[in-house]
């Protein structure tokens, strides 16, 4: 059993060490902005590789918004060496004001390339996304391919405080594109609703312009703000 403290962060975990691997059980990390539990196996030889399962207990996205790209650049030599697979789970506390109820992530990092599969649950709505990005590029581009499936559009929009008149209106949305984080530019390759709508080139340009004006005019991480999401939905509706 190992306990420790780094700056204002506390951690503890049980482990079994062998010259070729380190098995971790009951890891618990906590500071004022983030706490999580984790178990997994870290292979030390012949190459470093980590396979983990983690559960986020608490996270403060306000701090995430304060991250600067300069801080990230300093980590690039370290990121290049990472070879990690991590399954991450987050469940919102009952009666919390979080938009997201449950979040499941499958994260793979190798040689600077990050691949993420996301399952996001908001009430009875499910959002599935596949993302990939090369973190070592001078201008990293995040590619996304997402599906939103909601059996009740009215209930979903009510969650983001938008009034919707129709009852029990199903919503099935697909959107594909890429986001240049540093240049604050987004491109939509396709946007479609099942059966009855596929965005034209003019529509895609309008979505691009609206998204950039609302989400990317300020710091990138401000796109987490619910007010901006609400404004974007109203603009494109």
Regions found by a protein language model. Give the residues of each.
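Membrane-proximal interfacial segments on either side of biological membranes
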Residues: 1-123, 127-237
């Amino acid at each position: 059993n190992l306990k420790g403290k780094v700056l204002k962060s506390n951690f503890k975990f049980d482990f079994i060490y062998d010259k070729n691997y380190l098995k971790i059980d009951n890891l618990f990390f906590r500071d004022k902005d983030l706490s999580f539990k984790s178990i997994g196996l870290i292979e030390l030889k012949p190459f470093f590789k980590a396979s983990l399962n983690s559960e986020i207990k608490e996270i403060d996205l306000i701090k995430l918004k304060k991250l600067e790209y300069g801080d990230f650049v300093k980590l690039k030599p370290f990121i290049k060496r990472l070879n990690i697979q991590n399954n991450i789970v987050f469940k919102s506390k009952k009666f919390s004001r979080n938009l997201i109820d449950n979040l499941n992530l499958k994260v793979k990092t190798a040689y600077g390339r990050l691949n993420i599969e996301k399952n996001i649950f908001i009430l009875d709505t499910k959002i599935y996304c596949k993302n990939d990005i090369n973190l070592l590029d001078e201008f990293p581009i995040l590619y996304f391919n997402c599906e939103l499936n909601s059996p009740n559009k009215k209930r979903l929009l009510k969650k983001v405080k938008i009034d919707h008149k129709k009852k029990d209106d199903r919503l099935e949305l697909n959107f594909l594109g890429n986001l240049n984080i540093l240049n604050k530019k987004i491109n939509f390759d396709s946007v479609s609703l099942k059966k009855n709508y596929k965005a034209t080139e003019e529509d895609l340009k309008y979505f691009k312009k609206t998204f950039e004006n609302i989400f990317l005019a300020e710091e990138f991480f401000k796109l987490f703000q619910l007010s901006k999401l609400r404004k974007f939905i109203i603009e494109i509706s």
